[in-house]
Amino acid sequence: MPIKVGINGFGRIGRMVFQALCEDGLLGTEIDVVAVVDMNTDAEYFAYQMRYDTVHGKFKYEVTTTKSSPSVAKDDTLVVNGHRILCVKAQRNPADLPWGKLGVEYVIESTGLFTAKAAAEGHLRGGARKVVISAPASGGAKTLVMGVNHHEYNPSEHHVVSNASCTTNCLAPIVHVLVKEGFGVQTGLMTTIHSYTATQKTVDGVSVKDWRGGRAAAVNIIPSTTGAAKAVGMVIPSTQGKLTGMSFRVPTPDVSVVDLTFTAARDTSIQEIDAALKRASKTYMKGILGYTDEELVSADFINDNRSSIYDSKATLQNNLPKERRFFKIVSWYDNEWGYSHRVVDLVRHMASKDRSARL
């Protein structure tokens, strides 16, 4: 039987997650999306948003709308390839959402509002069994990154988990390979050159807490903060306290790139590191970590569903004589599409482990 899923927050990531599971052929087979929750419940508007996307193009599946009952004024149900998805009005308290009534088992929390564990636990009181937060979380929620530490999921302990950020999902697989293959990371600085997002301004506006963040996104390179590098220490404990970083928000609508400058724990060469990352991309990290030695630019990675695509051409070794520990690694990621696929993968992984635990 398909697992029953609800998506709280049908904005950019909520829609991308839904489209990702459709793309993977999971809708109605492994996953039954019972409901999507947002402030607006106009199914016709949701259908429009799904059909047409400036970055990712037209949705490949048929989307229509209908009414859940004759008494409602407007269509409040999406119909995608014959599968009905109810549009539910958002609530200030997740506990007030009708997950129990709808039979929802797993909630994908993508509003950006309930990222604290205690707040996200409201979904459990509303009747859901598990919650996946599609953002970094606070308050003790377990952070899981597919391909890195997803195996740490414990059905009896972890009821609210975080899928980390898109940037952590790009950086962590690279660091995971460096550690696993014995290169180690003594210390490192990460910069993400990150596409603008919906939280930014189209023209200069008010941003009291982040003055630079209030400047027009499409015409500026904007320095910003990120906790993505530090978060790697949460999923790879041996790197705890060794990584930090920053972000530059740039005038592109999608695809970002991580620049990791680090000191290895032993002498090595860029050729050895390159070979290890290439090997990992074809074996134990396949589908998570990619490898390219082509002359590619950001647009070439739109709709790439991998978490991190290592760029062999852009990687550097310090040219000082006898310096064999100082390197720069560059890796690309579609911060929308790749990340959304990992949310789907995490839900599937949890469901599989949960089923096994119940046997």
From Swiss-Prot:
The active site is at C166. This is Glyceraldehyde-3-phosphate dehydrogenase, glycosomal. There are two identical genes that code for glycosomal GAPDH. It comes from the Eukaryota. A motif (Microbody targeting signal) lies at residues 357-359. It comes from Trypanosoma cruzi. It catalyses: D-glyceraldehyde 3-phosphate + phosphate + NAD(+) = (2R)-3-phospho-glyceroyl phosphate + NADH + H(+). It is an enzyme of class 1 (oxidoreductase). Keywords: Glycolysis, Glycosome, NAD, Oxidoreductase, Peroxisome. Belongs to the glyceraldehyde-3-phosphate dehydrogenase family. NAD(+) binds at R12, I13, D38, Q91, S134, N335. InterPro entries: GlycerAld/Erythrose_P_DH, GlycerAld_3-P_DH_AS, GlycerAld_3-P_DH_cat, GlycerAld_3-P_DH_NAD(P)-bd, Glyceraldehyde-3-P_DH_1, NAD(P)-bd_dom_sf. One of its GO terms (biological process) is glucose metabolic process. GO terms for cellular component: cytosol; glycosome. GO terms for molecular function: glyceraldehyde-3-phosphate dehydrogenase (NAD+) (phosphorylating) activity; NAD binding; NADP binding. It is found in: Glycosome. Homotetramer. Its EC number is 1.2.1.12. The record marks H194 as: Activates thiol group during catalysis. Pathway: Carbohydrate degradation; glycolysis; pyruvate from D-glyceraldehyde 3-phosphate: step 1/5. D-glyceraldehyde 3-phosphate binds at S165, C166, T167, T197, T226, G227, R249. Its main location: other. SUPFAM superfamilies: Glyceraldehyde-3-phosphate dehydrogenase-like, C-terminal domain (SSF55347), NAD(P)-binding Rossmann-fold domains (SSF51735). The keyword Oxidoreductase applies.
